[in-house]
Amino acid sequence: MRARAVMVCGTTSGAGKSFLATALARWYSRQGLRVAPFKAQNMSNNARVVAGGEMGSAQYFQALAARCVPDVRMNPILLKPESETRSQVILLGQRRDELSAMQWRARAEHLWPTVHGCLEELLAENDALIIEGAGSPAEINLQATDLVNMRVAEAAAAATLIVCDIDRGGAFAHLFGTHQLLSLKHRALIHGFVLNKFRGDRDLLAPGPEMLKALTGVPTLAVLPMWREHGLPEEDGVFDAGPAFGSGLSVAVLAYPHISNLDEFAPLRQEPGLSLCWAREPRSIAAVDLLVLPGSKNVAADLAWLRQRGLDAAVMAHVSADKPTLAICGGLQMLGSEVQDPLGVEGAARGLGLLPYSTEFQPAKRYRHGRHSLAPLSGFWAALSGIGFDAYEIRHGETRAEPHPSARSLRAVADDHCGWQYGQTLALYLHGMLESPAVMRAVRRQHPDARRHSERSRGFHRPALRGGCIDVVARLRMARHDKSMTQIDQLRPTTVTILKSLIPGDRPWTSSPRHPPLMRDAPAAAMPSVLREPPAPGPQSPTSLARFPTTRS
């Protein structure tokens, strides 16, 4: 039996599509259904390594929420911006240069059969498919070449939600305008509106939802409260909402324009005893305890950006003073003497010359995911010695030590040329180390003031990988214990309302085993460690979803 599909579209980027799709994926999974996420095309430099290559982080985490093994078919097209006008195209997990060079309108039609094929396969293999759109479905200049919004909803016969960020203002205009700019056949797929990030008295919304329904025929199914600390990785932008420097360990992450895999730094914002800023000016890193150079999708361009802003001198002063520094992937490459690119993969550049090694880009991209631990470390990083953590590599660069006297102080700390320590600088090709609770505790404890913070302080808000699974609904239910967030518990009952209103029809859902076969039958090595445990029992049996109402409202 073909899966029932639910699609989450938004009026804008950042409306809450990824968050709501994750919540729906978990809720359906808790009913014992076999669930998978899908997003036809994602534009993001945040990616995770899976079998077959890489996929967007948002769909990776949605797969974990659905308790299924992440699969490149869940995000068949990933566009990784390299400049203002060019993106690297990842198709089914692998880089495809010929597609990157293709004119985008022609590329869209060329790729639709792949998108449609992945969609049909996932619909055939699952009971429920949670589909996420991109940006807005009402971009009338893009509708003719749509790969990711209403064309997908139509192909999947998906009951579609439109979610809007009410905190930005103009929510009803956004929803009405989006609805009106859709074709009549696509309007018929819209089953409800969702107002997200609401603060204040819900009674103040009246009679807005009723008037909107009178204009469009579409009900507002839910009003979801503002909740910044949900712990799920952000897909777009930098975490500028993080706390200002206060007590505890101060951390600055360089926010260069082509930063990649920034979602791995979410724990720095969530961890008690740490204070985080995203550094774009030299003064931002002048007095920090720990400086982080993250990954980059365009190392040459981001090195030029550092020099233009005077940040190169600030980084050199920090590292030369032997203050703690963490460099990951592209950041590691920046600290060396040079980046060579004989085949024109990304671009050559002169490095900062702070560590005695150089990097050469290779034509083949390296993908690897596994369990790692670092060799004995010293100084600030000593507490990390021997701690096991899950990590992944996505890179073209190969880095080797140079025949220089200072290279004797460069110590390999990870296998296969994946990491080095040089004084107080730790340089790694391994993404994801900071997502380990044990690693974060070890880092936090390096500052005397941080030891005052209780292990349980703000523990509920820690990143979504912690606690064994991503369970948005359970998180929202637990939030009632936080007096500052008393409205959060609204989401669970309103989520149930959404779910029971979405899918019309007379036939019952096909119930899968409590352990969905996609996860259960996979080899343990293929699964992230968070999936190697039984899922929590659902709050109600699958049969409670046997019949849905035949009308939207």
Question: Where are the regions a protein language model picked out?
Answer:
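Compositionally biased, intrinsically disordered low-complexity segments enriched in Pro/Arg/Gln/His
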Residues: 532-539
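Flexible phosphate-sensing "switch/lid" loops adjacent to ATP/NTP-binding sites
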Residues: 1-317, 324, 363, 378-453, ...
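Short, intrinsically disordered C-terminal tails of secreted or membrane-associated proteins
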Residues: 545-552
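Short Gly/Ser/Thr- and charged-rich N-terminal loops/segments
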Residues: 477-480, 513, 535
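A conserved active-site-flanking secondary-structure segment within enzyme catalytic domains
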Residues: 336-391
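Low-complexity, intrinsically disordered or signal/transmembrane-proximal segments
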Residues: 481, 487-490, 515, 540
